[in-house]
Amino acid sequence: MSTIEPIEYRRAGLCQWFTQSPGRSLLAVESYALRAVWPSLFSKVAVQLGCAGPVDLLEACNAQVRAVLDLPGVASTPVARVYGVPEQLPFDSRSVDIMLLPHTLEFADDPHQVLREVSRVLTPEGHVVILGFNPFSLW
């Protein structure tokens, strides 16, 4: 029997952590950094893969359409929600201008497949923004 928790529990645990003091502090820093990045990126469609707790990390993004893709039952932002898994994105090829991956790769069952899917749905001039923990830091 495997000791690895199903992705639903890991993602829900991360979303719960984002509601606590250390998680809120991290989200504040990440949100501030993204606000500086978004104005330089053109976007009609922006998609966030995975939960970032109660914070809308795409809020300052100038995209006409913004959505969050996450697992059913995982609490997320008030932005439009799409349910699915990052390893099988429910989007057409070359249909998304910006893909935001907030700690998505650390919690994915197959991070390489997530990146292949992101590459598939990204427009030719699209952008990928990856947020992640430094494995060599205290966090």
Question: Language-model segments: what does each one mean?
Answer:
Residues M1-S40:
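Class I SAM-dependent methyltransferase Rossmann-like catalytic core
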Residues H127-W139:
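Conserved class I S-adenosyl-L-methionine
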Residues D97-H112:
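A short SAM/SAH-binding and catalytic strip from SAM-dependent methyltransferases
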Residues Y32, A36-L89:
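Class I SAM-dependent methyltransferase SAM/SAH-binding core
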Residues H112-H127:
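A short glycine-rich, Lys/Arg-flanked "PGG" loop and its adjoining helix->strand segment in the class I
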Residues E87-M99:
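A short acidic, Gly/Pro-enriched loop at the edge of an enzyme's catalytic core
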